[in-house]
Amino acid sequence: MARGVNKVILVGTCGQDPEVRYLPNGNAVTNLSLATSEQWTDKQSGQKVERTEWHRVSLFGKVAEIAGEYLRKGSQCYIEGKLQTREWEKDGIKRYTTEIIVDINGTMQLLGGRPQGQQQGGDPYNQGGGNYGGGQQQQYNQAPPRQQAQRPQQAPQRPAPQQPAPQPAADFDSFDDDIPF
């Protein structure tokens, strides 16, 4: 019998600069608020309606350090973690909070370019027109890369035939769609 799955995937916008702190053992912990929005058309009024949901995200370890260094208010990111509810008592009243935990099994990816007003520094993520990672998304997994066992080579492999260079895609300026993002 399966024990269940606890997995949360969010793509959203940071609502404030991340808060980084360090535990006594030296491990980093970063807390941030991530906003996700959904939009729909009200059937009665025909007006577009948008609802924003705020999520508490706590990152641990190396991914916490990276988030603290590169995420800022307005940054877009992809978060993959697990849902966790904490309970504590304050003034005799039980309180609860639910948050997304990104630990060794989680993932954080920086998306899009730098937020407006952020300084253009000399860091490695300031290449390719201001996009993080030179226009490509950077993924930060906590898990170390898997080592694959070396198989003995049975026969020399022939080089693959040369493929023709890819041609640029068609012009999509006239493409009109009703996608809400």
Swiss-Prot record:
SUPFAM superfamilies noted in UniProt: Nucleic acid-binding proteins (SSF50249)
GO cellular component annotations of the record: nucleoid
Segment forming the signal sequence: none
Chain intervals with Gly residues compositional bias: 127-136
Keywords from the UniProt entry: DNA damage, DNA recombination, DNA repair, DNA replication, DNA-binding
GO biological process: DNA recombination; DNA repair; DNA replication
Pfam families with a match to the protein in the record: SSB (PF00436)
UniProt-annotated stretches for the region Disordered: 111-181
Record-annotated SSB domain positions: 5-109
Motif (Important for interaction with partner proteins): 176-181
Comp. bias intervals (Low complexity): 112-126, 137-157
Chain intervals with Pro residues compositional bias: 158-167
GO molecular function, one term: single-stranded DNA binding
Keyword DNA-binding carried by entry: yes
PANTHER family per record: SINGLE-STRANDED DNA-BINDING PROTEIN (PTHR10302:SF27)
Complex and partners: Homotetramer.
Function comment: Plays an important role in DNA replication, recombination and repair. Binds to ssDNA and to an array of partner proteins to recruit them to their sites of action during DNA metabolism.
UniProt-recorded name of the protein: Single-stranded DNA-binding protein
Provenance organism: Pseudomonas putida (strain ATCC 47054 / DSM 6125 / CFBP 8728 / NCIMB 11950 / KT2440)
Underlying gene: ssb
